[in-house]
Amino acid sequence: MLSIAHKIFGSANSRIIKSFYKVVQHINAIEHEFQLLSNEALKNKTIEFKEELKNGKTLDDILVPAFAVVREASKRVLNMRHFDVQLIGGMVLHKGMISEMKTGEGKTLVATLAAYLNALEGKGVHIVTVNDYLAKRDAEWMGELYDALGITVGCILTDTNDLERKNAYQCDILYSTNNNLGFDYLRDNMKFSRSEMVQRGFNYAIVDEVDSILIDEARTPLIISGQVDQDIKMYKKIDNLIYELVEEDYELEEKSKNIFLTEAGTTKIENLLTKHNLIPSNTSLYDIDNIIIMHYIIQALRAHKIFALDKDYIIKNGNIVIIDEFTGRMMDGRRYSDGLHQALEAKEKLNINSENQTLASTTFQNYFRMYTKLSGMTGTAATESEEFLGIYNLQVVQIPTNIPVQRIDLNDDIYCTEEEKFSAVIKFISECHQKLQPVLVGTVSIEKSEMLSKLLTQNKLKHSVLNARYHEQEAYIIAQAGIPGTITIATNMAGRGTDIQLGGNLKMLAKTALANTTDKEAIEIKYKQLSEKVKKDKEIAIQAGGLCVIGTERHESRRIDNQLRGRSGRQGDPGLSKFFLSLEDDLLRIFGSDKIKGVLKKLGMKKDEAIQHTWISRSIEKAQHKVESRNYDIRKSLLKFDNVINEQRKVVFDQRNRILDNDSYDISIIYRDLNSEIVNSIIHDKYYNLDDETYKILSSEFTRIYALTLDYSIISELESKEKVIEYLNKIVDEHFTQKIEEFKSRDQKLWDYAVKKVMIMSLDYLWRDHLAALDSLKCGINLRSIAQKDPLNEFKAEAFSMLENMMNKFYELITQRLSHLRFDIELSETQIPEYNINHTKISRNEKCPCGSGKKFKHCHGM
């Protein structure tokens, strides 16, 4: 029934493309008009468009001439003319959708259309990339085009200082990474004045490689953290005991990456702990005093039995560096939480760093949903269209290729063992190499890429390795992977954002070859020679069959496999793709059904013999689909919990911004209300019969909160609790009135600054502890389901109650801190120094990332 409807009405995707093609015809119709304009007249069109918007026109009203202007400027400045399909891609982005365009279709150029149009409003456009290299490259490359149209362009990299960041955010168009934008948001909400903040709002974002940022990294929170006091020696002590455990002592769940002690394992570890005096004799591991030890044990087990060196992490300069499971890139500055990172450091016999406490956090899911309009680009989004729509309200539109794809996708070859599989891969690579066909081999981990590299070396096949260890050479290596006879090994999809051009990348080859040449004539001659060579090499590569892409394992996500395939066959070039699998591969071993294995046995698999069957390929894709659905459910569930935290984050940040925006607080009004509540609370809690002991408690509380000493002789004569409350309210009011007047009379501005700073620091201090409490609550909340309770509803209720308590403590804390404030303490504002913006972890003696200039332990680490 559905297929009949598609035939009659067309799919939703085809209807969108059809409607945009009509607009393309209008753009093409006026192209000649803009060809006649001078460069200056073309630039002045930007001013005209801005005036039209001021006079009531919308962006949609000026889309046709604006796109025509960008296309004409691109021809003149970049020598590139937007194809019709690229114009459609630009319209998709402008409409707040995801533009799925195959590799080599020019996504970088497509973004200029929507970016220019939306920049005309003057509210800022953010173009988001996955790394600093791409942000810098695209800002410089496309910056020439924007400059020709009078549009300002900024770029923020990891090492950009605060002043440069602020200036970059004021530009019409900003290029940066998702990490830089997210951390700037968190840091801005740790600043002590609006003038120190760098961001200016969330208008429109175009996210390049949108699937990588909004899906692959969706579960990775952005965290600014500080060190906490901790017994780090315990990690080493527990690590030494893990070697005593055997397989029967624990249960491993590879799908969920969880591990549990068996009954035998619990008994063995308890005996070992007692023997090494780590727990008292005759106590259980599950006794309340020993629960923390269990935490150390589980994390040590995970470090040893689940997380693998050169797959999940590498060691660089004596530190554990996490490897992104989707891109194979190093995630510098990121640390595993909850003690896992320390357990890995203990396992690898490295220096153990203290665990961290969260100072500020958010997720990419919630960060990017703050933008008024959001769009994205990628070569592979259709398989995740449900998630994009469900979480981000983003529709995926598949853009037709400019020239039909010529790539041939061969069936998978399946072998019994990994050894047989890699033997077949080497043989296939050798055959391609003999006819000078360029080969790109995709692996799932650094370990596998280096194993394959050794095999190629043994077979005397020259090759390049592209993985997290050699990140700096990534762009150059991947750009030259199309040269005839070249063999390139790439971990997953490292090198995304750089096209593989058959014959080689002329621009990059020239940059390297001419780096030390200054003579203009020599440069021209050499460039011409290189151009001819690239042209000939391209023809040789085409005759050999184009780029051959080999996958050595199926990934959990079909999208990652499609990304690898998509490197071949760009812009109508010929190409080939093929996957080699084995029954020992993680996907088939963990997620593959027994049915697949049963069929393979019936087919009679022999040593070094491959089996090809469309049913098996479909079954593997079904297994991948199951994993994708499971991962989506996990992300969706995590988002529901994070939405609760995000709503609280908005409340606290809004309160913080209102404090920052108010230069003069009439704190006396707040005090009168607060003091009445605090006095009532103290009396209710501490006042029973006013004997000596009760008086001491009461006096201690008043000294702690108000810095006041109570007169026992006066209080002892009061007849009732009400009279005591009345008297205490009176002396507190008098105390505050006198204090406020004294400060104001000496320096009103300094007093206002002191009040604001005390309020901000108090809120930040409590919010930090509140985040830690929410993390603890979230960790154990799923156990409520055992009692037939909905964990999410339980989390919402308790989190709300915790927030109420936090805000009550906030008012008490500012009362206490202002009560103890003395005028002789220096309260002058400090200059805001530059600080390393790559900090996601702060030691207690480092400068606080809020920009106060103080050490962390004296500021947000108090």
Curated annotation (Swiss-Prot):
Name the source's superkingdom. Bacteria
What GO molecular function annotation could you give as one example from this UniProt entry? metal ion binding
Any one cellular component term from GO for this entry? Answer: cytosol
Q: What is its EC number?
A: 7.4.2.8
Catalysed transformations (reactions): ATP + H2O + cellular proteinSide 1 = ADP + phosphate + cellular proteinSide 2
> Entry's Gene3D superfamilies?
Helical scaffold and wing domains of SecA, P-loop containing nucleotide triphosphate hydrolases, SecA, preprotein cross-linking domain
SMART domains per the UniProt record, alphabetical: SecA_DEAD (SM00957), SecA_PP_bind (SM00958)
Query: Which EC class does it fall in?
Result: translocase
Q: Which PROSITE patterns match?
A: SECA (PS01312), SECA_MOTOR_DEAD (PS51196)
**Positions in coiled-coil regions:** none
- Tell me the cofactor note: May bind 1 zinc ion per subunit.
Topology in the lipid bilayer: Peripheral membrane protein
Its GO biological process terms? intracellular protein transmembrane transport; protein import; protein targeting; protein transport by the Sec complex
Cofactor or coenzyme needed: Zn(2+)
Q: Secretion signal: which residues? A: none
Tell me the residue numbers annotated for binding Zn(2+): C848, C850, C859, H860
CDD domains assigned: DEXDc_SecA, SF2_C_secA
Q: Where in the cell is it found?
A: Cell inner membrane; Cytoplasm
Which InterPro entries does this UniProt record tie to the protein? Helicase_ATP-bd (IPR014001), Helicase_C-like (IPR001650), P-loop_NTPase (IPR027417), SEC_C_motif (IPR004027), SecA (IPR000185), SecA_CS (IPR020937), SecA_DEAD (IPR011115), SecA_motor_DEAD (IPR014018)
Pfam families in the record, alphabetically?
P-loop_SecA, SEC-C, SecA_DEAD, SecA_PP_bind, SecA_SW
Per UniProt, the keywords (alphabetical) are:
ATP-binding, Cell inner membrane, Cell membrane, Cytoplasm, Membrane, Metal-binding, Nucleotide-binding, Protein transport, Translocase, Translocation, Transport, Zinc
Which residues make up the binding site for ATP? Q86, G104, E105, G106, K107, T108, D499
Family label = Belongs to the SecA family.
* Task performed by this protein: Part of the Sec protein translocase complex. Interacts with the SecYEG preprotein conducting channel. Has a central role in coupling the hydrolysis of ATP to the transfer of proteins into and across the cell membrane, serving both as a receptor for the preprotein-SecB complex and as an ATP-driven molecular motor driving the stepwise translocation of polypeptide chains across the membrane.
Assembly and partners are described as: Monomer and homodimer. Part of the essential Sec protein translocation apparatus which comprises SecA, SecYEG and auxiliary proteins SecDF-YajC and YidC.
**What's the name of the protein?**
Protein translocase subunit SecA
Q: Which organism is it from?
A: Ehrlichia canis (strain Jake)
